[in-house]
Amino acid sequence: MRDELLAAVDAARDEIIELCQALVRVPSINTGVMPTGNETPAARILQEKLAADGIASEILESAPNRGNFIAQLAGTAGTPRLLYLSHTDVVPVEDEGAWTHPPFGAEIHEGRIYGRGSNDMKNTVAAEAMAMIILKRAGVPLRGDLVFAAGADEESGGKWGFAWRAEHHPEKLRGDFGINEGGGALVQAADGRRAYLVS
């Protein structure tokens, strides 16, 4: 199965790149001052992409245009539950004239996608979405649930993103394990459990 999945990833290379480019083209700039963010268009791109492979999802708006995306592949036992965690907002473009390539052009030069968010972290958002799609296409039997959550407002503290979701939809974020961009720190959950982030 491993070799088949790796071959499926290779076969989906162009699709992964195109999804990343589509996400980078969304100017989901988070200044930290409302109204800001514009994450809902990125969430809609994800929703359409996953729906094409029969994966249902939701966009939960914490405020107008502050879309928090979530999708799930159900496992046979439900647990352990693995969360893919990422965000679709980006930091502001301070001096567009200093950019070699347009910040929301998602142009490819020398094998790299250039644009705001191409490294933090729309590349990971695209990879997580496509990992879920490839697992679904391959018919991989999952024991536990796989949840893909791409949040708003990470670049400005998370009030309209994962913090909002944890307050209003905590059941959608429950998990046994999570894969995120961070790592190395001890964190304490609201219920008192502690965990180390591993990167």
Positions of the model-derived regions?
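Acidic/histidine-rich catalytic neighborhood of metal-dependent amide-processing enzymes
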Residues: 119-199
